[in-house]
Amino acid sequence: MEAAVGYAADSLIKATELRLGLPGTADDLPSTPRGKKRAAAAEDNNANAAAADDDEHDAVEAAPPVAKAQVVGWPPVRSYRKSCFQQQSAAASKSKAAVSSCNNKDEPITKNAAPAPAASSAAAANGGSLVKVSMDGAPYLRKIDLRMYKGYRELREALEAMFVCFSGAADGANPSEFAITYQDKDGDLMLVGDVPFDMFTSTCKKLRIMKRSEATGLGSPRQMKI
């Protein structure tokens, strides 16, 4: 009897309970009190938060360790030392710039000065170099520098001083019996005085003092008297 009364009371409560839904539809699911719903929602939120915390912890453990960056300005340096360092660095940079500018200025000079030995050798080959002097009957050779003489007269006087027999001071030799000849760059034997002195110095390779009788035909009588 009591069970029947309880069942009737539950049916009455269920019939009069407000529900969300269309009229005439019945909810067979048992209704839960509001307090229980809130407790279940809180438990679900706590479970989700715990799962999210676990995921974040796992991600942090899996991530590589962050490199330690050096603290700027450590160890501390006093202000007067900083100023000294700055002055030294500025002076070093200025000295490097000065050295580089000097090197850049010296490069064209060295490039232009490189052909100097070739130019000097060419000048020595063209004229003014030492030439050998030989004399018929003399047992030795001499060398003279043609750049030291301004003309044929000075050259003859120097040759007379070199060879005593050619000047007539010994053995009673007569200077008029000898003639001065030279060998040019082509190897031809020519009489001294047939060309200007500058041309002679640039083409003369060897001097020879020979007897005038052997030099006949090499030049005019005026040239043979030089």
From Swiss-Prot:
Induction: By auxin. InterPro entries: AUX/IAA_dom, AUX_IAA, PB1-like. Residues 128-212 form the PB1 domain. It comes from Oryza sativa subsp. japonica. Keywords: Auxin signaling pathway, Nucleus, Repressor, Transcription, Transcription regulation. Its main location: nucleus. Residues 22-57 are annotated as: Disordered. Gene3D superfamilies: Phosphatidylinositol 3-kinase Catalytic Subunit, Chain A, domain 1. Aux/IAA proteins are short-lived transcriptional factors that function as repressors of early auxin response genes at low auxin concentrations. This is Auxin-responsive protein IAA12. Homodimers and heterodimers.
